[in-house]
């Protein structure tokens, strides 16, 4: 309904109160299944769901000039997926295959702003930087929600 009304709709993780996982692939797969379970004839396509989890999500956040799609001048935020897993379904549509069967465990490589942070099971990050960033995020969160622990 929101899409038909022309509203910006993005998908993201971060609300485990509604779904108890932080896996965008699972979020998109659940959306596909809900649409079909409701027998919605106009269910959202896999292509639309992928866009909702990437460019549309960036638009909702107002950061589409930096992320959300691969374009010159934007951050190179990329993941590479291993489609060889036994749980991967065979389909002619790679986007549908991605959304219907991939999970975080299929991610072979993660690149953020052009830097490879994770590749083939190995993290390429400085633990001191990670701890510093976690502290920064927690202090921002605490400033925004001082009554929360």
Please state what every model-predicted region is:
Residues 51-149:
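Active-site microenvironment of metallo-dependent hydrolases
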Residues 2-85, 101-102:
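His/Asp/Glu-enriched, well-ordered alpha-helical/loop segment
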């Amino acid at each position: 309904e929101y899409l038909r009304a022309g509203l910006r709709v993005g998908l993201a993780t971060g609300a485990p109160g509604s779904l108890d996982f932080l896996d965008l692939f699972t979020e998109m797969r659940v959306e596909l299944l809900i649409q079909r379970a409701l027998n919605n004839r106009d269910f959202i396509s896999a292509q639309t769901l992928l866009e909702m989890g990437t460019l549309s999500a960036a638009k909702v956040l107002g950061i589409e000039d930096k992320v959300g799609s691969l374009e010159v001048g934007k951050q190179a935020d990329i993941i590479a997926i291993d489609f060889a897993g036994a749980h991967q379904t065979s389909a002619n549509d790679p986007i549908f295959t991605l959304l219907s069967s991939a999970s975080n465990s299929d991610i072979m490589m993660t690149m953020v702003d052009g830097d490879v942070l994770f590749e083939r099971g190995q993290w390429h990050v400085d633990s001191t930087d990670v701890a510093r960033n976690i502290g920064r995020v927690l202090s921002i969160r605490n400033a925004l929600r001082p009554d929360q622990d």
